């Protein structure tokens, strides 16, 4: 039996259902016709997170009859995804939901009505996008293009060449991603200043602000260079015309996994293999993702919005969106991930999920979340912080089907310690009721990071450090230390003082805060010899 992921292949409904696939329960051809005639929702970024989350929520609305149109997807970075994966499969995709109990759910997602290359070199597709952006029916354009997609400058603060070229050329011949989006908004402006919501759903802080600043930079440059009609910048800056809601998204969607590919091939799925595009995107006819997901959205849509609330999106005000982000980043998810990443690298783990089988590491992250973090958590009111941690520690991180690695999460740790742990320390310092003496696990993570920077695991074997922009700055503090050599604590204290007092890394001056001794004690303990990291953590958690 062969299952073909095409519109014609879905006609063999019994074969798909016999293999355990949930199929679209709506008239897909009618949906496609309606969506093309009266498009409501365009999404930029055709990658895995879109197919696993946004496209599936559109399908839920279609399945339960609360909405009659799907989503149009446009890809402006790697258009091979559209040509080589979307269109050969008639814009169908398979969502494989990976559950913590080891089971999988398989869903054929059919809500994508049209897929387009957001590329001015592909004139028919870009002309179609321009047409869509002039439609009265268009309510929102959402984005998952990664945080880098909103960047207009390089690390030196200079405009990227493509951005500078677009600023000078105007909206008719854009090549940068944000330039394309600005060009399409200009079409909407020319069509009568029609309202629309531009919604970043990328996993970055204040994402709506990032999108707004990027697009208004184009409008400002184009007006200044007299490349657009007067009023375009004012149109973008009028929230009753164009809004930029802030959002918080939370769903882990790794690249296509070989074990999932094998399951689907055993079902009879034809052409299940992933492809790697010339831009190094891994894409397959399927996406594998965890079951847990959140999308909290600032409810500001000047032209209305689809009934996304009925598919699990949480609509609220900007302050609550911000609180949700702080809850997640400062307490309930990200600090736990970083702790496991650092010690996972030191203790030779290859999967985050495997670490949760270690009772010492499990106890450590439970202490960070429940005991040290929850007393100062920002409670958004729409989600329970304790329930969020419960889900993270009992369902999400232990999920054996989620191929997430400590090495991936350890990337850029120097940029993460401040927000993930420093904010908690600041809250303790500011509170008359709380005592810094209760912080035991967080200083151990800092000590673990110092030990990690040595590039030597707990067996004494070398390993490659994950990429980090400050490695050249911070590694020299520890690179000459040796395992098992007696450490002169006083000399070490002086050597490390400039690092431990660096509030840009830790969020606070650890010496001034009175936490440096705790960090040093744990670090010296971890230097005693092979196995010292595990021994230090075991002794520490035995006191919890």
Label each PLM-derived region with a short phrase:
Residues 1-44, 48-544:
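Substrate/ligand-engaging "lid" and interaction regions
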